[in-house]
Regions:
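Left-handed beta-helix
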Residues: 2-137, 304-618
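Domain-scale recognition of functional cores that engage charged ligands
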Residues: 114-139, 150-420, 425-426
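N-terminal regions that are enriched for targeting/export leaders
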Residues: 145-147
Length: 618
């Protein structure tokens, strides 16, 4: 927070002016005898620096209520490292914004260097081999701070189902991948760490979800569940008046101070030292709902090794004007920094930084030179530890929501707070470290299918990508189809159908558990004679278990295979049945608001786990 002399109440007593009680707001004047000495000094100071409105009507409140509010203000002061200093910092941010000054004024922008990794190329295969060798030395950090209300799901977003074929939640899906990585690539007797970043609203739902489901097979000791202890106050105008709840004058509504606070929290909890003792080399930060979150990992590790990166962002192609954050390289005074810029300010920043056309330029393929940020990053643990030790993990803050410049002294349309962003760890690196920041550039169909919007077409829709739970589910099915076709399997293309106004091809819907296929090379090992594998466009196929081999298959219907550890399943032959069908549904009738459901008419189920024979053949 800076090198300032301080006291328990967060201001400097030797510069505190003495003034008579008569100068205090009426509500505070008649409450001083109820407060401790520290609380009295704090409230006086708040009154003097333009926050006297906090105490309006205090004289009408019961004594116990005023005492409790005094306790709350004192606690808030300590958590913020001095509420007065916090207010002054907020005023500086607001003054700069009102003056039209971006934090990036004086910087030059340029597109990051990109080289697209494509399936089928030699480097793609080599990247997978190299990356897989290090996957067991990765600790995973999930950003699960979001509720799903903005996408029509009234719970923690990480609890949303990835697909309706298996009804697997994102949280379970991620744990499945981590456990598969641990088994395949982990060190003997070492568990891969899984850190879950939560918010005030998602902590309990996620904690209970894990407990109720026995942590989905993961050992509780390898899961760290973090939540910030400090929310930050909001402000109502350019003079930085603290927002007071109009319906309850004893409440100062606050919000989480952005996911950037987790770097400081990871530092405070000493997790980096614990992970280092486990032999961890990298931290993989990823967001709460991306059905392809783990597909990019080996390629990111490879790129980090190849280019000697200490911080590596995952990026995908992006169209100009697309409402996704973008990766931008900024330079000033011989200092370079790679940042993930929010789409709301991207156009403005680019114009400030010499790109006069802003976010409208594109290449011959119609894509912006500034690729989309996926909020996924791979950090070298040794570098991360040094950065946290040096900075405490404190990041620059920005205004959220951005107030209108036309409002000036009037109240903002909605209260504004100062927040920090998890991905801005790049801004506190040393210059020599900042020079070792880059991106792994992949096609979205292999790396990025997030849930960010409601499941419906809108009047604003153009040719921009739509990121919702429907498209994320369909992207997962399509990913498996693409890989099977790439190795020579014959997989029919499904018919395009409309769901909630979106034209999609969900069929055939294929779900392969990470224990079955974790990497592209696994598909080649499991499907031993690809030309002998045919899957019709109406088919459904679900497979779990490492020891499942498919030598030949003609599938027209639904096949589900579940193979426990120590057993083997070989698939060969022809299967035809009524199958499962994805059909349109009233979006209001399903908890997932997807606009379709799975009609489970008929299936062939193979389970290997309790039979006398270790081998089952279809």
């Amino acid at each position: 927070m800076g090198n300032y002399p301080s006291t328990s109440c967060g201001f400097d007593p030797y510069i505190f002016p003495t003034f008579d009680v008569e100068d205090l707001p009426v509500g505070l004047k008649f409450s001083m005898m109820l407060l401790t000495d520290d609380q009295s000094r704090l409230c006086r100071r708040l009154s003097e620096i333009g926050q006297e409105h906090i105490f309006d009507g205090w004289e009408k409140l019961p004594p116990d209520t005023r005492r409790a509010f005094g306790d709350y203000l004192e606690t808030l002061d300590k958590r913020l490292g001095g509420i007065e200093r916090y207010i002054h910092r907020m005023r500086r941010l607001l003054d700069r914004h009102r003056a039209g000054l971006s934090r990036w004024n004086g910087w030059d922008a340029s597109p990051p260097s990109t080289s697209l990794l494509k399936l089928g190329e030699k480097e793609f295969e080599m990247a997978e081999r190299v990356g897989c060798m290090k996957m067991g030395n990765v600790a995973f950090v999930l950003n699960a701070t979001e509720l799903g209300s903005h996408v029509g799901f009234n719970d923690a977003l990480a609890k949303l189902e990835v697909d309706l074929t298996t009804d697997t939640s994102y949280l379970e899906y991620y744990i499945q991948h981590i456990l598969a990585i641990q088994k395949r690539y982990g060190r003997p007797n070492k568990r891969v760490p899984f850190c879950i970043l939560t918010s005030r609203k998602t902590y309990e739902p996620i904690k209970n979800f894990l407990s109720d489901n026995e942590h989905f097979g993961m050992a509780p000791v390898q899961i760290w569940l973090l939540r910030p202890s400090t929310d930050v106050p909001c402000f109502t105008d350019y003079t930085a008046k603290i927002f007071v709840d109009p319906d309850d004058r004893t409440k100062l509504p606050s919000i989480a101070n952005g996911d950037g606070c987790f770097h400081a929290l990871i530092h405070e909890t000493g997790l980096v030292n614990e992970w280092e003792k486990l032999g961890i080399e990298y931290l993989y930060f990823f967001e709460g709902a991306n059905s392809l979150a783990f597909q990019a990992l080996p390629y990111m590790i490879y790129a980090s090794i190849r280019d000697e990166l200490v911080l590596n962002y995952l990026a995908v192609p992006r169209k100009p004007g697309e409402k996704t954050d973008a990766m931008v390289k900024l330079n000033a005074n011989m200092h370079e920094v790679m940042v993930s810029l929010e789409h709301e300010c991207l156009d403005e920043v680019l114009k400030i930084c010499a790109f006069t056309k802003g976010d409208s330029i594109c290449d011959e393929d119609g894509y912006s030179p500034f690729p989309a940020s996926t909020h996924t990053m791979l950090v070298v643990l040794e570098t991360y530890r040094e950065v946290l030790k040096r900075t405490g993990g404190e990041l620059p803050t920005t205004l959220m929501p951005t107030p209108s410049l036309e409002q000036d002294q009037k109240q903002f349309m909605e209260p504004v707070a100062a927040i920090s962003r998890l991905t801005e760890i790049s801004t506190i690196l040393r210059p020599e470290q900042a020079a070792q920041v880059g991106i792994t550039y992949m096609e979205a169909k292999f790396a990025y299918a997030p849930v960010r919007a409601p499941n419906k077409a809108t009047t604003e829709m153009t040719d921009m990508p739509v990121y919702c739970s429907i498209t994320a589910e369909v992207a997962l099915y399509a990913f498996h189809r693409t890989i099977l076709r790439s190795i020579g399997c014959r997989v029919e293309e499904g018919d395009e159908k409309e769901y909630n106004g979106l034209q999609l091809k969900p069929n055939p819907n294929l779900v392969f558990h990470p224990s079955f296929c974790l990497t592209v090379s696994d598909y080649r090992d499991r499907f031993q004679d690809p030309p002998q594998v045919y899957i019709s466009k109406r088919s459904t196929m679900v497979v779990r278990g490492r020891s499942v081999l498919i030598t030949s298959l003609h599938l027209d219907g639904c096949l589900s295979v579940d193979c426990e550890e120590g057993y083997n399943v070989k698939i060969r032959g022809k299967l035809q049945n009524g199958g499962w069908e994805i059909i349109p549904d009233d979006p209001g009738s399903t908890i997932n608001m997807r606009g379709f459901k799975v009609n489970r008419k008929d299936k062939k189920y193979i389970y290997a786990g309790n039979s006398l024979s270790p081998c089952t053949i279809m």
